[in-house]
Swiss-Prot record:
It comes from Rattus norvegicus. Detected in liver (at protein level). Detected in adipose tissue. Detected in liver when rats are kept on a fat-free diet, but not when their food contains unsaturated fatty acids. GO terms for biological process: brown fat cell differentiation; defense response to Gram-positive bacterium; fatty acid biosynthetic process; lipid biosynthetic process; lipid homeostasis; monounsaturated fatty acid biosynthetic process; positive regulation of cold-induced thermogenesis; response to bacterium. This is Acyl-CoA desaturase 1. Residues 93-96, 237-240 are lumenal.
Length: 358
């Protein structure tokens, strides 16, 4: 792939910023520079944002990893939550239809708070959102209860920059269970604290809405993740409190959590690597179904600045559909999308041969 790429930006707020190849006159110059420019610096179209670009210069120190320090509070609470979710499954046949629809609705909205909000907007800056959309996404993110946006984005940027090392919060080289949920049940590796603490998070520190959520996160999550989804079915259509709590709240919350976690575990262990065979992330359609579009993970790690997190936009990608709808309403803009030429060049250079164009 050429070392330099140009942006085509229209004055319209609904435009998509596209990475394109340089004019033909620059091809030879581009090839010469390719020899000098590291792969991880070639392709970013956000000069103001580099904290999520993989840094291959960082390597784990030799020697045995530190002993795991279990966080028993998290272990007990997570176990109880999953037991509650299993009981919720048994209550599904006797639940009211409105309760099930409410659970699905709450699942989708809270999932968007992670995918369109914490992930594609605030972690990667792949598009921009006007205030009404940012307010919606911060509320949806609070509904999901997966840490506040600031902490989620810091961990995720570290995951990309130091992927598959001890500085990666959910390093998949430590196994499926660790990358899925185990990383939340133990103290963070010292490298995660060290490297994560050095990341530039000034963009989020400067965003008042993100800092407001962080300041009031505990009461916010109690209201939006637990109290509201339980009270609405109970009060509005006479569902039993038991069904409201265990189906609408515990089961729904557990499903959203595991859908997100599968991106960290299954999508780093199972699937093809059509864009870059040198990284662990994979294309996993089943993960995309549950995580509303986040399973095209080899593409996402190859091009973390693409707002679609996929080559194919709406294909099994409800999050991209949502962002495009918001763009049509004028609430999302400056959506960054990698050009077809750039994608094909990357496939040819580093793909595993599984792409249909190969």
């Amino acid at each position: 792939m050429p070392a330099h790429m140009l942006q085509e930006i229209s004055s319209s707020y609904t435009t998509t910023t596209t990475i394109t190849e340089p004019p033909s006159g620059n091809l030879q110059n581009g090839r010469e520079k390719m020899k000098k420019v590291p792969l991880y610096l070639e392709e970013d179209i956000r000069p103001e944002m580099r904290e999520d670009i993989h840094d291959p210069s960082y390597q784990d120190e030799e020697g045995p990893p530190p002993k795991l320090e279990y966080v028993w509070r998290n272990i007990i609470l997570m176990a109880l939550l999953h037991v509650g979710a299993l009981y919720g499954i048994t209550l599904i046949p006797s639940s009211k239809v409105y309760t099930l629809l409410w659970g699905i609705f709450y699942y989708l909205i809270s999932a968007l708070g992670i995918t369109a909000g914490a992930h594609r907007l605030w972690s990667h800056r792949t598009y921009k959102a006007r205030l009404p959309l940012r307010i919606f996404l911060i509320i949806a993110n609070t509904m999901a209860f997966q840490n506040d946006v600031y902490e989620w984005a810091r961990d995720h940027r570290a995951h990309h920059k130091f992927s598959e090392t001890h500085a990666d919060p959910h390093n998949s080289r430590r196994g499926f269970f660790f990358s899925h949920v185990g990383w939340l049940l133990v103290r963070k590796h010292p490298a995660v604290k060290e490297k994560g603490g050095k990341l530039d998070m000034s963009d989020l520190k400067a965003e008042k809405l993100v800092m407001f959520q962080r300041r009031y996160y505990k009461p916010g999550l109690l209201l939006m993740c637990f109290i509201l989804p339980t009270l609405v079915p109970w009060y509005c259509w006479g569902e039993t409190f038991l069904h409201s709590l265990f189906v609408s709240t515990f089961l729904r919350y557990t499903l959203v959590l595991n859908a997100t976690w599968l991106v960290n575990s299954a999508a780093h262990l199972y699937g093809y690597r059509p864009y870059d065979k040198n990284i662990q992330s994979r294309e996993n359609i089943l993960v995309s179904l549950g995580a509303v579009g986040e399973g095209f993970h080899n593409y996402h790690h190859a091009f973390p600045y693409d707002y679609s997190a996929s080559e194919y936009r709406w294909h099994i990608n409800f999050t991209t559909f949502f962002i495009d709808c918001m763009a049509a309403l004028g609430l999302a803009y400056d959506r960054k999308k990698v050009s077809k030429a750039a994608v094909l060049a990357r496939i040819k250079r580093t793909g595993d041969g599984s792409h249909k164009s190969s």
